[in-house]
């Protein structure tokens, strides 16, 4: 039983039968995805990346992570790593994206409708990839655009008549977009330049006895709860000025919307499969409703758990798919994405770990190639069935279950223990929904976050960059993580969900 009671302890999402409910609008967009061509890798991958990297308008934080600076002995493998990159979303997020596009086409203002009305699903994902800033951080939204323009604040007006250049919807993401972008990951194989410690600054480590030379890298984005009335704060924190009927809160799950605000809240109620509340309806009970750092707010532990569940499913299913392709067991390095400066409640770390354990058990026999999950830099050392060295037992698993470690480790430290030899290292890192991989890296702030230190220790600054790895890190290469179907390219997923060409629109 969860620390937070039976309601929070419910298993969600379901493993089967949870494919998105499609309106006529969404069905048409998903049907169109069946024609999307998955890009094919070739010998020219490397040359294209090197050429486009040289043309990229911003200076890199360090050059040691560029493909052209890698050892010639690594280049054949890097050519394959370039082609291994793709954007990834959970299948519930796919349904949300389709509903969001329909919402903007119906309820959007004069600024929004011209942007969204002609977008395909893959076109929308491409927008989320290429319209983001290079850097975007701090409470005042300090930013650096790919164009080189920089400043702070102004994003709340994007997509309204009050927007001002350069922060206009045609060129950048609105806060509504960023909230959806936070549910998008990019994954690839990569070389590791060093162990990835926070202060690595791109130094080249040639010691193969301490460094895992290559593995998988996945950018994961936590809930940004540090900005009131924006992002996931809208769903997870119940606040007096935010949670009002006028803003669309408090409606039943199936209640039809009659205003733009009501329809926007409908999207998120359906995504999280729970109603939202008006401030005053929720009383702190340390079960579903917990305290928040702001004593006037109430923290919804259930919705926080569901936000985590979507991310954890993605990471676990992606690690499984990557490991299965190479016939290995995955060693997953997990960091507490969203548990730093974005955190709004002390109980979040415990919710994080309880949810991760439940998703491992729930996905269970779909994770036969996941061998170990290593929680790194967590303050909690015991949580439910999770402790250093514990085994999450899974009937039929080739290793009887998934081993758990909880200790501090550098992301790319050598898997030197005999029982870990031959495993595939899958590293998660805390990314941002409105920044290129590395974020502060592009402002030469190399030691500020795990995001920038990851860009200094892997090839993500090029491989996960939609301006540089244009063929593979793009919306047309979208992959869907489905608990029922595994990880599939969007075209294959669409064909499975929409069974035949003759299905009615």
From Swiss-Prot:
GO molecular function: ADP-ribosylarginine hydrolase activity
Keyword match Hydrolase: yes
EC class of the enzyme, as a word: hydrolase
Residues annotated for ADP-D-ribose binding in this entry: 198, 336, 338, 340-342, 377, 432, 439-440, 450-451
UniProt keyword annotation of Hydrolase present: yes
Protein purpose: Protein ADP-ribosyl hydrolase that specifically removes mono-ADP-ribosyl modifications from protein arginine residues.
Protein name: ADP-ribosylarginine hydrolase CG2909
Source organism of this protein record: Drosophila melanogaster
């Amino acid at each position: 039983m969860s620390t937070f009671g039976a309601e929070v302890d419910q298993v969600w999402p379901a493993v089967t039968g949870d494919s998105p409910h499609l309106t006529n609008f969404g069905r048409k967009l998903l049907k169109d995805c069946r024609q999307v061509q998955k890009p094919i890798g070739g010998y020219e991958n490397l040359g294209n990346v090197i050429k486009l990297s040289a043309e990229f308008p911003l200076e890199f934080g360090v050059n040691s992570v560029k493909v052209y600076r890698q050892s010639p002995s690594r280049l054949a493998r890097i050519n394959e790593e370039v082609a291994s990159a793709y954007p990834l979303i959970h299948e519930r997020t796919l349904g949300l994206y389709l509903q969001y596009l329909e919402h903007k086409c119906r309820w959007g203002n004069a600024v929004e409708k011209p942007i969204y009305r002609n977008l395909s699903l893959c076109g929308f994902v491409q927008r989320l990839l290429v319209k983001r800033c290079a850097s975007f951080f701090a409470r005042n939204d300090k930013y650096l655009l790919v164009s080189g323009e920089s400043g702070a604040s102004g994003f709340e007006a994007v997509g309204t008549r009050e927007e001002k250049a350069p922060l206009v919807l045609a060129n950048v993401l609105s806060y509504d977009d960023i909230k959806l972008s936070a549910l998008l990951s990019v994954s690839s194989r990569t070389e590791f330049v060093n162990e990835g410690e926070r202060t690595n600054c791109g130094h080249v480590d040639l010691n193969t006895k301490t460094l895992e030379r290559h593995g998988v890298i996945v950018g994961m984005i936590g809930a940004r709860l540090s900005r009131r009335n924006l992002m996931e704060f809208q769903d997870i924190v119940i606040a007096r000025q935010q949670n009002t009927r006028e803003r669309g809160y408090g409606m039943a799950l199936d209640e039809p919307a009659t205003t733009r605000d009501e329809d926007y809240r409908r999207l998120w109620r359906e995504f999280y499969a729970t109603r939202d509340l008006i401030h005053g309806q929720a009383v702190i009970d340390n079960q579903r409703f917990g305290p928040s750092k702001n004593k006037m707010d109430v923290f919804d532990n259930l919705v926080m758990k569901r936000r985590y569940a979507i991310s954890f499913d993605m990471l676990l299913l992606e690690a499984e798919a990557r490991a299965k392709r190479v016939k290995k067991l995955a060693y997953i390095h997990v960091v507490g994405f969203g548990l730093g400066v974005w955190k709004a409640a002390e109980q979040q770390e415990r919710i994080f770990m309880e949810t991760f354990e439940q998703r491992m058990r729930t996905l269970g026999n779909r994770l036969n190639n996941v061998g170990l999950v290593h929680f790194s830099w967590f303050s909690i050392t015991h949580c439910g069935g999770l402790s250093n060295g514990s085994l999450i037992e899974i009937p039929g698993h080739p290793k009887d279950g998934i081993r758990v470690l909880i200790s501090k480790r550098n992301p790319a430290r050598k898997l030197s223990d005999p029982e870990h030899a031959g495993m595939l290292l899958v590293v998660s890192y805390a990314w941002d929904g409105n920044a290129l991989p590395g974020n502060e890296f592009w402002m030469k702030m190399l030691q500020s976050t795990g995001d920038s230190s990851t860009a200094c220790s892997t090839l993500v600054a090029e491989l996960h960059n939609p301006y540089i790895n244009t063929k593979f890190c793009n919306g047309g290469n979208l992959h869907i993580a489905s608990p029922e179907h595994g990880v599939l390219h969007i075209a294959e997923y669409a064909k499975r969900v929409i069974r035949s060409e003759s299905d009615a629109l």
